[in-house]
Amino acid sequence: MQIEYSKRAVKAISKINNPFKKNIKEAIEKLPSGDVRKLKGYSNAYRLRVGRYRILFDMNGKIEITDILPRGEACKG
């Protein structure tokens, strides 16, 4: 499946430390498998848990990574 990144997601990846960055990239390559949950209130929005980070993405025939946030920020909504 094709994977695209929003500008916000690219910026977030650039700020993450290398050990976490490697884990995040590996998890994204394995999408849509992994610890994925559908976000309530959205038709095609999901989140992937990778350690202390949450990868937010949409799935509409392709996967678009919309944001990558630390757990606390992702849970605030």
Give a label for each model feature.
Residues 13-16, 26-32, 57-59:
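Alpha-helix C-terminal capping segments
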